[in-house]
């Protein structure tokens, strides 16, 4: 007793449908995971900025790394204190590629796209920062949406 051609075609069709559903679900899971990592990177960067500013209030200088470039970690350097919040926030943001990488493009030569300009980051996982007259503005693009955080001058830590 053997299977008929129709029975085999039905089994193949069912396997195809299950595979298609699995691929769609997997893509959704990975997109959600990348977005979560991106948002965690943003949160970590905000904490690092406040931490470095606080350290600079109590020390003559703080150790900060230069920007991660060409697959090479930044070098340690001393940033003299006191500095204004915008300078510390900018230097901390530039050095952030030493601590995190883009979940959307994990093999970048600079780990994470970091731009010092007033607009939104052009790619997912990218960071844009700019010291403005109203304060320091930080932006990060995660899954097509830009997250914005601004420290108003009146509320600098």
Language-model region placement:
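Short, low-complexity cationic-aromatic patches
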Residues: 17-25, 69, 125-131
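Alpha-helix exit/C-cap motif
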Residues: 43, 47-79
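Short, surface-exposed interaction loops/tails
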Residues: 116-157
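Secreted/processed peptides and extracellular or luminal domains of membrane proteins
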Residues: 44, 62, 86-88, 148
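N-terminal single-pass transmembrane signal-anchor helix
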Residues: 1-27
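Aliphatic-rich helix starts adjacent to a transmembrane/signal segment
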Residues: 25-44
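Surface-exposed intrinsically disordered loops and tails
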Residues: 66-128
